[in-house]
Amino acid sequence: MGQIFSRSASPIPRPPRGLAAHHWLNFLQAAYRLEPGPSSYDFHQLKKFLKIALETPVWICPINYSLLASLLPKGYPGRVNEILHILIQTQAQIPSRPAPPPPSSSTHDPPDSDPQIPPPYVEPTAPQVLPVMHPHGAPPNHRPWQMKDLQAIKQEVSQAAPGSPQFMQTIRLAVQQFDPTAKDLQDLLQYLCSSLVASLHHQQLDSLISEAETRGITGYNPLAGPLRVQANNPQQQGLRREYQQLWLAAFAALPGSAKDPSWASILQGLEEPYHAFVERLNIALDNGLPEGTPKDPILRSLAYSNANKECQKLLQARGHTNSPLGDMLRACQAWTPKDKTKVLVVQPKKPPPNQPCFRCGKAGHWSRDCTQPRPPPGPCPLCQDPTHWKRDCPRLKPTIPEPEPEEDALLLDLPADIPHPKNSIGGEV
């Protein structure tokens, strides 16, 4: 089945292209709950299956793990089926909030078939993130941070704001794997966040710890010191888990970014598929919105207002300007750049002319289709011959010397006049 996956090598494996980070972290948390632990082969098969499943993104908006499990082929290799089973069980255990009843009106109710009136919005029942859960009965798995672990975590949250779903899911996954103490969490906070964010987090954490100590925690002994000190003991696994939950909850009170949100300026390109545009919006909202902020109303509003004109016309024609996101995706599913075929204007061919060609004098073809070379416009400027161009003039060609007669060739072999030697005294010999 492959070698057991080493958790110290990379705490957060890379997600497949096109899948939001918080969805991928849910799959990772479910995979780490397997007993025995997942292998690298399991992660490879999980990525391979998710790439195939992303071709039908209906199960994402909202996410439905039962529908995703129905797309899994029978006998699929790896432990993908077990991972999906854990996600389905976790999704069923978390109670969903009931949808608010529609407001009753004393007057007549509008008909359901009116396309101008959007249907009432129903809150998604699927959880956006999974809580930190450890295998039941597992021994303490505390491991101090290493610099490569901190660098890998910081790289994952570099594009996410503190308190956003992607930031929180990454931190939850790191807490689940390393089971850090209070001192480890303080080091992680100082490494990831600025001094201002760390100060605000520290104030909120102190208030949460005071409330928890007043309320009472299982295993907490006031005579043994504050909760922060007792959570540093690796043997106090229960108190350490309580402190981890309080430390994560302190991020909920952090203020958002003061600058204009980047997701408000995301527009759909003229040739961009609609589902790719919605996925970009979804990822940007995950990175920018603080945890607990309802994302779906903002996503549905931007999915219509920031779409291109053609997709807006499709949504208006089908009455899905404020519908659930799945209906909007299905409405624009048929519109893709591949379907926009170019209309070519084909001119009918003219019949061959009956008149003779201007070049060769034969009938049955046009002069532009004639195979004869084009005649020169006038006589050659060198030799005044009207039958050829200047580039073909014989005067421009190099002249070949004529062969000499045979007698002259024989004379060339004879020596030339030999100079007579002179005496040293003077005079010829």
UniProtKB/Swiss-Prot annotation:
Lipoprotein as UniProt keyword: yes
Pfam family, one: Gag_p24
GO annotation, biological process: viral translational frameshifting
Zinc fingers, CCHC-type class: 355-372, 378-395
InterPro entries reported for this sequence: D_retro_matrix, Gag_p24_C, Primate_lentivir_Gag_pol-like, Retrov_capsid_C, Retrov_capsid_N, Retrovr_matrix, Znf_CCHC, Znf_CCHC_sf
Disordered, as annotated region: 93-142
Residue positions of motif PTAP/PSAP motif: 124-127
Key words of the record: Capsid protein, Disulfide bond, Host-virus interaction, Lipoprotein, Metal-binding, Myristate, Phosphoprotein, Repeat, Ubl conjugation, Viral nucleoprotein, Virion, Zinc, Zinc-finger
GO cellular component terms listed in the entry, alphabetical order: viral nucleocapsid
Residues with the Phosphoserine modification: S105
Keyword Ribosomal protein appears in the UniProt entry: no
SUPFAM superfamilies linked: Retroviral matrix proteins, Retrovirus capsid dimerization domain-like, Retrovirus capsid protein, N-terminal core domain, Retrovirus zinc finger-like domains
Lipidation positions, renumbered (N-myristoyl glycine): G2
GO molecular function, one term: zinc ion binding
SMART domains assigned: ZnF_C2HC
Residues the UniProt record annotates as site (Cleavage): L130, P131, L344, V345
Placement of sequence motif PPXY motif: 118-121
Other comments on record: HTLV-1 lineages are divided in four clades, A (Cosmopolitan), B (Central African group), C (Melanesian group) and D (New Central African group).
PANTHER family with a match to the protein in the record: ENDOGENOUS RETROVIRUS GROUP K MEMBER 24 GAG POLYPROTEIN-RELATED, IGE-BINDING PROTEIN
Protein name: Gag polyprotein
